[in-house]
Amino acid sequence: MEYFAKRIIPCLDVKDGRVVKGVNFVGLRDAGDPVEAAIRYNEEGADELTFLDITASHEGRKPIVDIVKEVAKEVFIPLTVGGGISELSDIYDLLNVGCDKVSINSAAVKNPDFINKSSKRFGSQCIVVAIDVKKIAPNKWHVFIKGGREDTGLDAIEWAKEVVDRGAGEILLTSMDTDGTKAGFDIEITEIISKLVHVPVIASGGAGKMEHFKEVFEHSADAALAASIFHFKEIDIMDLKQYLHKNNISVRIN
């Protein structure tokens, strides 16, 4: 299902308190301070920010509430936070320091009822389920967890339907096949899932140039997330929005 204005969402992947960006989830490189990056995106016209502690679930750590608190003090656009969220108290702590939505991934796979409980407790509008997918055969994608380290064996399309049925208000869909490549979003799986579910789908993984955003929006994505092209200033967010506007894609321009 498509929603009116398409959203541009920079992603802050954080490891050890620093923004990093790798290729296909490995080969990480330092991209700066998360608070400074958040301030810059807020000023540049990002619609939202997504902030992911990419090692929290793998290492069994809790969300980095302190960093989130500092970021939330400085930005005035919706902030989604993920990484290490496995209990209702984790969600409460994050919402309490100023984040607007939480993103759950590994915990949702291991305990699907957690989606129901968190949605019922806090409202579906603030529960995002992140789904990392990889194509394993023609027309077949599996769900991966732990930063792409573990194949769950779950069918990605069926899992997307299930998380929405359980109360997810949004899906953050990352293609591991395109992530970090700058060769374009994974149009095929993004379009399939976007047309299948009745909640917004955020496309993630593969953005390299402005045309990629236009393409994924024309194929039903409601929002597009990217990291390195924004972190390293390869694409300016306002320039991107002007480009999309000229190409008849509805975006918010401040």
Curated annotation (Swiss-Prot):
<comment type="pathway">
    <text>Amino-acid biosynthesis; L-histidine biosynthesis; L-histidine from 5-phospho-alpha-D-ribose 1-diphosphate: step 5/9.</text>
</comment>
<dbReference type="InterPro" id="IPR050064">
    <property type="entry name" value="IGPS_HisA/HisF"/>
</dbReference>
<comment type="similarity">
    <text>Belongs to the HisA/HisF family.</text>
</comment>
<feature type="active site">
    <location>
        <position position="132"/>
    </location>
</feature>
<dbReference type="GO" id="GO:0005737">
    <property type="term" value="C:cytoplasm"/>
</dbReference>
<dbReference type="GO" id="GO:0000105">
    <property type="term" value="P:L-histidine biosynthetic process"/>
</dbReference>
<keyword id="KW-0963">Cytoplasm</keyword>
<dbReference type="InterPro" id="IPR006062">
    <property type="entry name" value="His_biosynth"/>
</dbReference>
<dbReference type="GO" id="GO:0016829">
    <property type="term" value="F:lyase activity"/>
</dbReference>
<dbReference type="InterPro" id="IPR011060">
    <property type="entry name" value="RibuloseP-bd_barrel"/>
</dbReference>
<keyword id="KW-0368">Histidine biosynthesis</keyword>
<dbReference type="InterPro" id="IPR004651">
    <property type="entry name" value="HisF"/>
</dbReference>
<feature type="active site">
    <location>
        <position position="13"/>
    </location>
</feature>
<comment type="subunit">
    <text>Heterodimer of HisH and HisF.</text>
</comment>
<comment type="function">
    <text>IGPS catalyzes the conversion of PRFAR and glutamine to IGP, AICAR and glutamate. The HisF subunit catalyzes the cyclization activity that produces IGP and AICAR from PRFAR using the ammonia provided by the HisH subunit.</text>
</comment>
<protein>
    <recommendedName>
        <fullName>Imidazole glycerol phosphate synthase subunit HisF</fullName>
        <ecNumber>4.3.2.10</ecNumber>
    </recommendedName>
</protein>
<keyword id="KW-0456">Lyase</keyword>
<dbReference type="InterPro" id="IPR013785">
    <property type="entry name" value="Aldolase_TIM"/>
</dbReference>
<dbReference type="Pfam" id="PF00977">
    <property type="entry name" value="His_biosynth"/>
</dbReference>
<keyword id="KW-0028">Amino-acid biosynthesis</keyword>
<dbReference type="GO" id="GO:0000107">
    <property type="term" value="F:imidazoleglycerol-phosphate synthase activity"/>
</dbReference>
